[in-house]
Design a protein with these regions (language model features):
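N-terminal secretory signal peptides
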Residues: 1-8, 15-27
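C-terminal segment of N-terminal export signals and the immediately downstream linker at the start
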Residues: 6, 27-45
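Beta-alpha junction/loop-to-helix N-cap segments that form part of ligand/metal-binding clefts
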Residues: 40, 53-60, 72-142, 154, ...
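Hydrophobic alpha-helical segments within soluble ligand-binding/sensing domains
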Residues: 94, 153-176, 217-220, 243-244, ...
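Extracytoplasmic ligand/sensor domains, especially the bilobed periplasmic-binding protein
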Residues: 106-209, 259-283
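Segments of small-molecule ligand-sensing domains
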Residues: 305-315, 326-386
Length: 395
């Protein structure tokens, strides 16, 4: 009896010791696994302030793609965690958000809200060495892998956007007269000089360049100058909406027959529709399909199933940013490489003929810091939609 009790007790002790030993072995490993588990997307997102119309869409786009990936089991068994902070579209707040998020999480990829933030945080990204960043900026300056090795643009840079429009113009009307109208801001001035040179190369004639003060309301003097130059095409840049409708309405009243064009931040459907009847036929460059496009795009169908109401082009941009972030992470993990900034960027640059599920209408290859692809769309005010006016144009 005693012998039996002792052996039972010994067995229990041994089992306990074995369990404790196993726990000692597995516990640190599970902690390690836990530590390596999440792929973290940080975000400086302008949910309030002047850029909130875009920030809300960007945030939802990132969230939705993260949900799709996590619902499918994550990436190589790891869950994706998205940690955004509102910045109000202020650089100092954005920098503070970056510091807070990166101090509390092991961030792998980061979405920034502006050109100002991208430039300010760049030395910190280089020092950190473990983060790949993209964001809401398409600034030409950022399209420089030497100067900005840990960043990329989710689409063409502003100069490439002009390049796509100019290529379309040269095909539609060889030798056309073109006007550039832009805001007196870093955003506005960005593509102007290079694009004038590009226009010449394409045999186009830039007949006038008009710079307006940011937020200027009275453009009557500038419209007279524009009318005298009599362009076939007028490209606006450095604005969201105002003063574009004022230019178009007054120009038409004065007998101008120019076609009117814009770049990405003017081209959301909801923005263009605010131009009213005079905005009919307004054209511009868009690197993504619109929410309501009818051409085959499996990822767009998925988005429409998740969100039956219209989603902005900013939403699609955020969604594609998350897709490229996580594709880069997946390629690092597939190659058994640590997710450093350099490895994530090299993985991004290995993307060749990549299908975004139709969100960009052609397969994409990312050689440097941008994706120089886009399509010209045109406003159909009767249908209240943007419709394709060109094929997909690659530079």
């Amino acid at each position: 009896m005693d012998q039996q009790r002792i052996s039972t007790r010994r067995r229990n002790l041994m089992l306990g010791a074995a369990a404790a030993g196993a726990a000692a072995l597995t516990h640190p490993l599970s902690v390690l696994a836990q530590g390596a588990e999440d792929i973290v997307i940080g975000g400086s997102i302008p949910m309030t302030g002047v850029f909130a119309f875009a920030g809300v869409g960007i945030n939802a786009g990132i969230q939705d793609y993260v949900k799709i990936v996590n619902d499918a089991g994550g990436i190589k068994g790891r869950k994706v965690k998205y940690v955004p902070e509102d910045t109000g579209y202020k650089v100092d707040v954005s920098v503070a958000a970056f510091k807070k998020i990166t101090s509390q999480n092991k961030v792998n990829v980061y979405y920034g809200d502006s050109t100002g933030f991208a430039k300010t945080i760049n030395p910190e990204l280089d020092r950190n060495g473990n983060i790949l960043m993209a964001g809401a900026s398409f600034a030409t300056e950022l399209n420089n892998p030497q100067k900005y090795p840990n960043q990329f643009l989710v689409g063409p840079d502003y100069t490439e956007m002009f390049g796509i429009l100019l290529k379309h113009i040269a095909k539609e009307k060889p030798g056309a007269k073109v006007a550039f109208v832009y805001s007196d801001s870093e955003f506005g001035r960005d593509p102007i000089d290079e694009s004038e040179a590009e226009a010449k190369k394409l045999g186009l004639n830039v007949v006038v360049k008009i710079m307006t003060p940011p937020g200027s309301v009275d453009v009557s003097g500038e419209v007279i100058k524009l009318r005298r130059a009599a362009p076939d095409y007028t490209i606006f840049h450095g604005y969201i909406l105002a003063p574009i409708p004022e230019f178009i309405t007054q120009g038409k009243q004065q007998g101008m027959t120019s076609k009117w064009m814009g770049t990405f931040w003017t081209m959301d459907s909801s923005t263009v529709m605010k131009m009213g009847p005079d905005g009919d036929g307004f054209m511009g460059v868009m690197p993504f399909r619109y929410y309501y496009d009818t051409e085959k795009a499996p990822m767009l169908e998925k988005i429409r199933a998740m969100r039956p109401e219209y989603q902005s082009t900013a939403y699609i941009q955020g969604f594609v940013a998350a897709m490229l972030f996580l594709e880069s992470a997946k390629r690092c993990l597939d190659a058994n490489k640590p997710m450093t900034g350099a490895n994530l960027k090299a993985a991004l640059n290995s993307i060749k003929d990549f299908d975004t599920g139709g969100l960009i209408g052609v397969p994409i290859t990312i050689r440097g810091n941008s994706i120089p692809v886009g399509r010209v769309y045109k406003a159909d005010m009767k249908a209240q939609k943007m419709v394709a006016a060109s094929d997909w144009i690659k530079l």
